[in-house]
């Protein structure tokens, strides 16, 4: 069952607020006996902080490239998620990237997804868990030919750890190491909120939203059966840079009828297409939704994606408007007729300094 096919169960389950506007519910509460691991959800706690990394990256069958760089890992949601950013150089090359790690309380597993500054697109997720001090996640490689990928964390101490990426072309029977890194902790305060350079290009479209905002939300919990019933939420929306000109994160914490809720929006800029991709996640489900895609024009940002409701493909639209130095406005709506008419599902206003 897809997230939108659970539309009829919306009122019975908590909602992911940042994707509620697109009719995207939270995962239902865990049933008795489901996997719950307090230790597992803190498996990446060793990783938080700033690290020096020494990398060997395979360039060909017989050639390895050496690189050095910095890794900064930030805890989110009390350790149930973390955001890693890496910058490294060597042998005439340089790259920036970020990795989002999310803990799924239902499965008891972690997922990770990587994006490079070259295109701002999240790779397919890898899944796995830690056991006996060793973390192993599996998925598909993100470059070119699809190979099985295995990421491994080992030899973890308070001051160092080892990381490897390996690939397999035979379903996991044999593995070839592609990336080897040894990391040593740096005794410095992590630079989570990256200083940003002011600019007018499209990569700076979300600069207006940086900071800590008070937010008020009105949302329709079930736009098909009860489009006239609105529910109110209040809380904070904190937005900060991950990388200066291609990535930022918005963290939403609000209180509503179902209690306290935490959501995240990861916004990545694609320099090739000059578009933004906005990925959503919430702490209850620990999964990353497919992105909305769009751009700003004339001070208005419009983002859309396709979803299914009742077996029909529908459009979901998010519009940013009314942008001033101290406030901004969002409207969300869904359309079942290709955009001819829209059913509003979300209205929010962020206010700075109140």
Give the ranges of each region predicted by the language model.
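Bacterial N-terminal signal peptides that target proteins for export
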Residues: 2-16
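A general, composition-driven signal for non-globular sequence regions
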Residues: 8, 21-22, 261
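Hydrophobic small-molecule pocket/channel-lining residues, especially in calycin-type beta-barrels
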Residues: 30-354
